[in-house]
Swiss-Prot record:
The gene is rapZ. Coiled coil: none annotated. This is RNase adapter protein RapZ. GTP binds at residues 56-59. One of its GO terms (molecular function) is GTP binding.
Amino acid sequence: MVLMIVSGRSGSGKSVALRALEDMGFYCVDNLPVVLLPELANTLADRDISAAVSIDVRNMPESPEVFEEALTKLPASFSPQLLFLDAERNTLIRRYSDTRRLHPLSSKNLSLESAIDQESDLLEPLRSRADLIIDTSEMSVHELAEMLRTRLLGKRERELTMVFESFGFKHGIPIDADYVFDVRFLPNPHWDPKLRPMTGLDRPVAAFLDRHTEVHNFIYQTRSYLELWLPMLETNNRSYLTVAIGCTGGKHRSVYVAEQLADYFRSRGKNVQSRHRTLEKRK
């Protein structure tokens, strides 16, 4: 397992790096004091999960020896790696001017330029020990995240997770949906007394919907639409694509259609999840 320690000058992109590492499956902690690194690693050791911790100038140890001592106390199962982010002085000044945020050392009555210079001196022990130094001066947020994925995972694109979720319009549209499809026009099993207590996961309901050509046409055209744009979505620096399928109550039609779409894209080797909001509420 890896313990990725992320440091660097303020404004160089530590928060962006931490979010990218979280997307890669790292357990992330922001601004953890150095002396607590062994405690965090021991807590995660049994969970078999890599971790990433950001350290900024505010929680730097008083001496490099404190940092080295903390690393020696890590469990043997963890391999520490130090990532240091930096940027040109003028770039950092511009970024602070654009965001209008205060530098962490500004409370010491220093000008922005002086705070940046002092921070550089304070962080030098970490910079000199870094396994990887990235200059973000000419990088966008997305380019930094992409570089980290390339360096750490050996591939450029993160794997997109497709989420197909069913819902009932009477309960409201999911706020996390990227696409919303309305299937209330499809034949409704609700009007069959035998099917009413069932859900779209049950075979009799699936057989009822499977008999209707319009159901097949909708599923085919929806999956074709998603397939058309999926390559661009996969390169758009996103982790999830959430497709919401809604019917009146979220019990029959939307559940069946969401499952059919999920099965199709799963069979194509995509990373797929399915969930059913109305059914989850009934548990």
